[in-house]
């Protein structure tokens, strides 16, 4: 067995979780209460990666919902999927983190971490061959940043050898949910840098633009955004759950995408991004999808990939795709001069093909298509996201604005400068990996 446990932290984590589990149930032919639907085709026991089956034939998600305040999780308990989740795997506190990393990490969050680890241990005991853990959280919120970082620290201590992958909502360049987002994001990045093996980032603005421009949603809400994120998460995890001609497991992601431990922030792109009316006019061939994923309009983070160099690239196809077509698409990509790889990693492409076609939520924004592609690329272009964050952090921290709220919650002020230095080092790391080896040799000694 290759079980994966998902932990959804804070409002963003839980709401993305709702969209993901809604999609997983559709993909595995399960009803909202976790039972196999009569007309669903046999899924070859594929769901056991994410679901455990009870003696009564009910499928229960291997997942935890955690939030420091009860509001968002209460909505789940009263929503259409209330019977799907085990009530004990929904853990809430009494007061929220008030957009404050220090509250989520040091004071309010500290009280909740032991019950969370206890529940996680029970989920882990129920697995025969656990592959790893997914942690979903935002960088900007108090619970997502503070408690998310605390959780990853504890996971390193208790489950050191298992793969820990993050799905993070990164602060968008223009859209902001709170003034102190840059502080929270910088602090959580610094804390989790050594504890996370691979972090897939999405930013709300990039997703928002996709919903408006590609999918024709006039006023996208969080449900629209989260359902699109869920498609990306589903594609990344599809080969763990379904058979395929080229399967990719969790450890393979890391091996192929993370050349150095700190450079572990792949950029995700997805194709086709089609609404139902546009679907009739598009061919959606394997080559078309592959080229689309290299365009900035299909990326989940706002940055210009043409400004950077690729270190590694994972192409995860699903549906009606044959390996021969994927290899032909990659061959034509390699002839394009605009797509640059670092000179120390000349081949750079890892292919995955999963036979299960992508599912869509009835009444959702995305059209039903026979095939799709999710591209995960480790590129130096994502350093632009760190530059933006550091700039915003510096503007506030120069005046020590809002710092007293953090220090008042048992945090040392020195942690701010420590985190800032770490991020400066991360920017430098990205700069260095993008430098050609020949240039680096001329500068250094032999």
From Swiss-Prot:
Active site, per annotation: 252
Positions annotated to bind GTP: 11, 69, 138, 142-143, 177, 204, 226
SMART domains: Tubulin (SM00864), Tubulin_C (SM00865)
Pfam family, one: Tubulin_C
The keyword Lipoprotein is assigned to this record: no
Subcellular location, record wording: Cytoplasm, Cytoskeleton
Record site: Involved in polymerization: 446
Binding, Mg(2+): 69
Protein EC: 3.6.5.-
Alphabetized CDD domains for the sequence: alpha_tubulin
Region (Disordered): 34-55
Skewed-composition ranges (Basic and acidic residues): 35-46
Family statement drawn from the similarity comment of this UniProt entry: Belongs to the tubulin family.
Role played: Tubulin is the major constituent of microtubules, a cylinder consisting of laterally associated linear protofilaments composed of alpha- and beta-tubulin heterodimers. Microtubules grow by the addition of GTP-tubulin dimers to the microtubule end, where a stabilizing cap forms. Below the cap, tubulin dimers are in GDP-bound state, owing to GTPase activity of alpha-tubulin.
Full protein name: Tubulin alpha-1B chain
Gene, per the UniProt record: TUB-1B
